Amino acid sequence: LAQLRGHTLPLRTDWLDAIAGSLIKEALNAPLPWSYRGVIHPDTDPILLTLIDTLAGDGFGKLAPSTPQPPLPKDVTCELERTAISLPAELTLNRFNPNGLAQSQVLHRLAILEIPGIVRQQGSTLTLAGNGEERWKLTRPLSQHAALIEAACFGATLQEAARNKLEADMLDAGGIGSITTCLSQAALAGLASFSQQLLEQLTLLIAQENQFAEMGQALEVLYALWRLDEISGMQGAQILQTTLCATIDRTLWLCESNGRPDEKEFHAHLHSWQALCHILRDLHSGVNLPGVSLSAAVALLERRSQAIHAPALDRGAALGALMRLEHPNASAEAALTMLAQLSPAQSGEALHGLLALARHQLACQPAFIAGFSSHLNQLSEADFINALPDLRAAMAWLPPRERGTLAHQVLEHYQLAQLPVSALQMPLHCPPQAIAHHQQLEQQALASLQNWGVFHV
């Protein structure tokens, strides 16, 4: 059999194929176990199972020292020795000290290459989150060395291989979320330098994103890494600056072209507005981000806040962002004017956007409270009941202390300052819209009685 295959000496597969051909006389329902990888097929012949079990044994072999190998396994061994990591072990480290950071970066590079036996049991997915503690379970399974040999196709050193593997993953990413995840892994692994070709391709990939609600998390993570992640060496990295600028540009494009978000995307939609506003506010305060035009972004926000056919949520969010940027035309009066232009059903959505982005500028202004109270008084009973759920939900953006301040100002507006603030914050045993509906029914009943001459005011 070896001679037929052109082998000078019989190889292991020659011996196994010869034994199988000699012992098995019936057709096989599954391929030979040594012809594929993974779990043995359930229909494998019992003779083959016995053969594998007998020949496999309990020992672990080693490649002969003269066996040609790629340089990656040796480099990994050197990196593990340099950082004092031994396998097997259970390792607890802290990324906020130099030794722990070096160990964490080596282990994260191995995890990027999907090397068996390298499992992180505890730790944050972001470099800037948490207390920096990580717990790893390190083993040396039989498949580990083979996986290192296969991973050598990405590079000769651990750093190069992990970087090239991440580049391949980012090019295969299905959206901005996957790209952000890869860049978070790069930060954990201390990989800040990537090829210029990747930067150009990432810009094209991000320009294909079509979901505004997906941009918030990406903006938040990318901006934090670009501006603050000095520990991992990602602060000001070119890869982050390129992707961040492309993401901001795409977000601005989407916020002017998207429609009304559905219920499932409502909070993610607002999160995107908040993340965008946070970055624009920092640019307004003097942060330099080449490639992003603050004046163009402000002009877009002005257009969006005044667009009659735009969703009320976006109009409110755009005006709230302008207030955060201290735009001269964005004020409490402008917010009241916009609310007056909208239908009662849209007022709650607009208030959502306003308070989500500019609650400090609005909730504590007596002029806005007085004007908003006047706006509510002009609504009919039916319109008020329909708008009440959205209006109450919008107030949920105020934290407890700010709700107390708002309640105090509402009492002062109605000249009821002698009442405690808790009078407006007492929990109700039924929904407020139900109370308003019952009050409406009561007024209708009294009007009917008065019409019949039974009741007189």
Predicted segment positions?
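Core structural elements
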Residues: L1-A2
